[in-house]
Amino acid sequence: MMSSKIPVTIVSGFLGAGKTTLINKVLKEKHGEHIAVVINEFGEIGVDHQFVLDVEEEIYQMDNGCLCCTLRTDIADMLKSILMVKEQNGINVDRVLFETTGLADPAPIAQTFINVPFLNEHFILDAVLTVVDSKNFLYQTTHQTEPAKQVGFADKIFMSKHSLVDDTIYAKVINEVRSINPFAEIQDLDARPVEMKDMFGLELFYASEKKILEMQENSEEEYCEACGHT
């Protein structure tokens, strides 16, 4: 069961993977949810905002009732501003969708929600979603480390651009994804339109909280070794 804290969904994916597909689903459709969406930049989304709720932080209310803003400060300050706008305007915020940059490892961002007291008090991680580019993933993983990190930390994986590759290549991509992360659910975005239930209310992150604890332990061990402690 989720607590009274506001659930947070993190969306990751390498450059051009198709995160915008999921974000536009939230910002453009009449789904009845009040979701605060923190994105990289408005230019990639191409949505029309309705009301300016906070000029300084550039927080907008969309036609479907969702809030949208870009990450101009650190995560905690941005979400404090969203909560302030929520209280001042009497707006519901059912959940938060946080888009990482294409080159970001989602693990440190997830750790921030756990380790920063304000965020841990008001928010709870629901799931980390990663979008995988079926056409370019095999090439990307041989030249960059981030795509594998994004897949490895995912609670759920959305495969994009399946229609752009043949079945043999797609099978190789799935095998590679599974070798990196054998536990995450995989959904093909080309098989059917994504629905809100595919993205939210999954309650998957704390089912695998162990990964965060292991990362924290590893970080502490590396610090001790660097300082000459045992």
Place the predicted regions along the sequence by residue.
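Nucleotide-state-sensitive switch-loop elements of NTP-binding domains
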Residues: M2-S12, A17-Q140
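C-terminal accessory "lid"/substrate-recognition subdomains
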Residues: K156, V165-T230
